């Protein structure tokens, strides 16, 4: 995998060519000061939201105690930086997409941080919703700091223009998402995306799903992407219509799900212990899904549920982060 392959999978590199078969989206350049803010791991203070009205007098003794909790004159007041011009553009884009969006950077979405949101979802309605997810996500940090981590070429890293991608929010059923692997412009493998769960309809409709994805690939994807080797994700809705979700590099940086990269690169044993019919259909991609006999696995995102910020909270090393987090939750509840 080379650096150019990674660049070709940036959202803005492929979206103009596949706009008609994917979810409506808006791409906004990410200002340098916003990037710096997102990479600053010193605090969970989140900007993008007006502070709630403050009372001139405390309503109770408890509130008075809270206000006077720290009178150390050396204690710094933590305030979130504001980006009014960028915030306006983001809110206009969100409104144009129906009021709710799925956010991501050039490559990654903050899927590992869904747990921190009030609704345990990546659904965002404001810039502060987006900032909370981004600042809590290792995936987003990796986009910023290690986009070419698995590339084999030694050329200098290209300059990246980072962008905020806002996708119209759609309620997608995890059991209808599939990852497709393409080698030399040939679809060689299809894997259930949410492989930690068993979905009865996938097992029963396997051949139909495979044919549907093959038809979509031949009509809309094959020979149209910038590389010969790549990975793409699709969603098949209840009517059987296929939607393109994303492109990823063909290599270790991308999760191979129910395949191994050794299998995909060599194309050996792709059908494995699957049906003889599959093995005989040499022109058909291998299709893998979680069988009912397989023990349901924990979500791969569970390991991301305790970021350092919360380890600091549990050990009492950073009380400011707890205050900031509780204030943010209170603001969200008041807005709701």
Curated annotation (Swiss-Prot):
<dbReference type="GO" id="GO:0005737">
    <property type="term" value="C:cytoplasm"/>
</dbReference>
<dbReference type="GO" id="GO:0044183">
    <property type="term" value="F:protein folding chaperone"/>
</dbReference>
<dbReference type="InterPro" id="IPR009772">
    <property type="entry name" value="CDC123"/>
</dbReference>
<feature type="binding site">
    <location>
        <position position="246"/>
    </location>
    <ligand>
        <name>Mg(2+)</name>
    </ligand>
</feature>
<feature type="binding site">
    <location>
        <position position="109"/>
    </location>
    <ligand>
        <name>ATP</name>
    </ligand>
</feature>
<feature type="binding site">
    <location>
        <position position="111"/>
    </location>
    <ligand>
        <name>ATP</name>
    </ligand>
</feature>
<feature type="binding site">
    <location>
        <position position="170"/>
    </location>
    <ligand>
        <name>ATP</name>
    </ligand>
</feature>
<feature type="binding site">
    <location>
        <position position="248"/>
    </location>
    <ligand>
        <name>Mg(2+)</name>
    </ligand>
</feature>
<keyword id="KW-0067">ATP-binding</keyword>
<protein>
    <recommendedName>
        <fullName>Translation initiation factor eIF2 assembly protein</fullName>
    </recommendedName>
</protein>
<feature type="binding site">
    <location>
        <position position="179"/>
    </location>
    <ligand>
        <name>ATP</name>
    </ligand>
</feature>
<feature type="binding site">
    <location>
        <position position="246"/>
    </location>
    <ligand>
        <name>ATP</name>
    </ligand>
</feature>
<keyword id="KW-0547">Nucleotide-binding</keyword>
<keyword id="KW-0963">Cytoplasm</keyword>
<keyword id="KW-0460">Magnesium</keyword>
<comment type="function">
    <text>ATP-dependent protein-folding chaperone for the eIF2 complex. Binds to the gamma subunit of the eIF2 complex which allows the subunit to assemble with the alpha and beta subunits.</text>
</comment>
<keyword id="KW-0479">Metal-binding</keyword>
<feature type="binding site">
    <location>
        <position position="248"/>
    </location>
    <ligand>
        <name>ATP</name>
    </ligand>
</feature>
<feature type="binding site">
    <location>
        <position position="233"/>
    </location>
    <ligand>
        <name>ATP</name>
    </ligand>
</feature>
<feature type="binding site">
    <location>
        <position position="193"/>
    </location>
    <ligand>
        <name>ATP</name>
    </ligand>
</feature>
<feature type="binding site">
    <location>
        <position position="177"/>
    </location>
    <ligand>
        <name>ATP</name>
    </ligand>
</feature>
<dbReference type="GO" id="GO:0005524">
    <property type="term" value="F:ATP binding"/>
</dbReference>
<dbReference type="GO" id="GO:1905143">
    <property type="term" value="P:eukaryotic translation initiation factor 2 complex assembly"/>
</dbReference>
<dbReference type="GO" id="GO:0000287">
    <property type="term" value="F:magnesium ion binding"/>
</dbReference>
<feature type="binding site">
    <location>
        <position position="104"/>
    </location>
    <ligand>
        <name>ATP</name>
    </ligand>
</feature>
<comment type="similarity">
    <text>Belongs to the CDC123 family.</text>
</comment>
<feature type="binding site">
    <location>
        <position position="168"/>
    </location>
    <ligand>
        <name>ATP</name>
    </ligand>
</feature>
<dbReference type="Pfam" id="PF07065">
    <property type="entry name" value="D123"/>
</dbReference>
<comment type="subunit">
    <text>Interacts with the eIF2 complex gamma subunit EIF2S3 (via C-terminus); the interaction is direct. Interacts with the eIF2 complex alpha subunit EIF2S1. Interacts with the eIF2 complex beta subunit EIF2S2.</text>
</comment>
<feature type="binding site">
    <location>
        <position position="107"/>
    </location>
    <ligand>
        <name>ATP</name>
    </ligand>
</feature>
<feature type="modified residue" description="Phosphoserine">
    <location>
        <position position="60"/>
    </location>
</feature>
<keyword id="KW-0143">Chaperone</keyword>
<keyword id="KW-0597">Phosphoprotein</keyword>
<feature type="binding site">
    <location>
        <position position="167"/>
    </location>
    <ligand>
        <name>ATP</name>
    </ligand>
</feature>
<feature type="binding site">
    <location>
        <position position="169"/>
    </location>
    <ligand>
        <name>ATP</name>
    </ligand>
</feature>
